[in-house]
Amino acid sequence: MYMDFEYQRTLDQHKSNVYKKIKSVNLGKEVVAFTAGNFDIIHPGYTATFEEAKRHCDKFIVFLHGDPSSTRNTKYKPVVPYYDRYKMLMSIRHIDEVYMYQTEEELLELMKTFKLDVRILGEDYLGKPFTGDDLEHEVIYTTRSHEWSTTKFKNRIAAMTFIQNEDLRETLEGIEPDSWYANRILEGNFEA
C-alpha cells in the first residue's frame, strides 16, 4: 500500500498539537479520549488504532455497541457475543474503560454524561455525519495505514474455510450463485 509520508507526518503533528492544546486548556488535568463501535472480531487493525489513540490522551474510553444491525440494516450482526467483546476490549492495555450501549441515542447520552475531550474516528469518517458530531469535542482522525478491516477479516476466514474444506466446496457449487454470498467465494473474490 502506498503511504504518503509527508501527509502522515503532518497528520501526526496535528494530533500532537491537539493533545497539547487540550492539556493546556484543561490546566494540566488529564485528557480523556473516546471512540465507539461494535469491535467485532478484534484484529491487528483495532489494536493499532487503540495504540495510536492512547498516544493522544491520558485516559482512553471505548463505547461498545451491542448490535448495530438492530437499528441499521447496512451493518452486519456481530459474530462475537457482546460480553465477550467487552472482556476482550478490557484486556487491551491501551484501553482504560469500556461502557456498553445498544442504540445511537444511548451513545449520545454517554457522550454527554462523561467529561470527554477528544473523539477518535477513522479517517473514513472525514466529511461524513456521525453521532455526536454537534458536540464540543476535538476530533482526531486516525489513518488506516494498515490493511485490516473486520469485513476483510471475515471474508478471509470464509475464503480459507472454503479453500481448506472440500465438502463445503462441493456443497456451494450446487447453490445458485445469486442466491447466497457464495458467488463471491466461488469467483475468488475474498475482499469486501
Describe the residue ranges of each PLM region.
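Nucleotidyltransferase catalytic core that binds NTPs
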Residues: M1-A192
